[in-house]
């Protein structure tokens, strides 16, 4: 996925929905497509408003998480958005200001409209109630922007493969009960919860996606080749792409052939690539530096 990205600061935004809507997505998981579509339309329209003739198009990646910190059903979408877009004429326009009032209200309007189209007239009463109780739109917030390539790649690794619960949050299992902890979202207070093993499993399996359902989706210039994409600078240069691909193939081949992981340290930790040094063209020399992630 990192091969798709352009070398630009990116913004991490999170699009959330009110609690009274969550049950609809739980009963009919096809509605999760509406969540993706509402986010897509909102972001593209925000950039299009800058200059309709140019129709600036950003690159963004949407990742659906259906879980909250306490493992409850809480569908929301994390988005990595380039701080800029490619235009019909201008190769790239930097966009630093994101109008969050627009994002909140537009996302609310589009999602409720899409849900009404899918659910039917019975949804109108819920829709009216939500507009009354959510006058400022749905909650959309942004974390600090990712200003360099390393920050963007760290984000990719952290959110794209994020499990429902990390093993480090499971404190105890005695054969019958599981104790896990989390920081409560409202005040970051540490909460410890003990549930039966069966209930713990139930909390986990509700987050298993339907077969063939895509939890990660690419939009804008990351979805397909834009006519000005050849003028943009990629996050990872082509020379490094080839080497990284061969490095991954090398690890996989050794593992399946000999059952060993070549980058697993004798201390038990997995080593990671720090840097790749390239010399000349084509690639004639490379140095692979590893360090323990401990």
Language-model segment annotations:
Residues 1-294:
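Beta->alpha loop/short-helix hinge microenvironment recognizer with preference
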């Amino acid at each position: 996925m990192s091969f798709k990205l352009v070398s630009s600061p990116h913004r991490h935004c999170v699009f959330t929905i009110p609690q009274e809507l969550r049950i609809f997505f739980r009963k009919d998981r096809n509605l999760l497509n509406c969540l993706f579509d509402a986010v897509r339309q909102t972001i593209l329209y925000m950039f299009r408003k800058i200059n309709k003739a140019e129709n600036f198009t950003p690159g963004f990646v949407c990742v659906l998480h259906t879980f909250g910190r306490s493992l409850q059903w809480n569908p929301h979408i994390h988005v990595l958005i380039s701080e800029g877009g490619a235009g019909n004429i201008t190769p790239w326009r930097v966009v630093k200001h994101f109008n969050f009032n627009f994002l909140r209200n537009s996302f609310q309007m589009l999602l409720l409209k899409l849900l009404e189209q899918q659910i039917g007239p019975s949804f109108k009463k819920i829709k009216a109630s939500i507009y009354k109780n959510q006058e400022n739109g749905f909650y959309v917030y942004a974390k600090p922007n990712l200003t360099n390539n390393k920050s963007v790649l760290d984000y990719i690794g952290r959110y794209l493969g994020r499990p429902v619960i990390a093993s480090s949050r499971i404190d105890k299992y005695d054969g019958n009960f599981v104790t896990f902890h989390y920081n409560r979202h409202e005040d970051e207070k540490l909460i410890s919860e003990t549930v039966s093993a069966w209930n713990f499993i139930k909390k986990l399996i509700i987050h298993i996606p339907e077969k063939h359902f895509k939890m990660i989706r690419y939009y804008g210039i990351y979805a397909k080749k834009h006519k000005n994409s050849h003028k943009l600078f990629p996050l990872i240069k082509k020379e490094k792409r080839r080497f990284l691909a061969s490095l991954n193939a090398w690890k996989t081949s050794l593992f399946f052939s000999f059952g060993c992981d070549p980058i697993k340290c004798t201390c038990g930790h997995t080593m990671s690539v720090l840097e790749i040094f390239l010399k000349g063209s084509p690639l004639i020399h490379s140095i692979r530096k590893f360090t323990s992630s401990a």
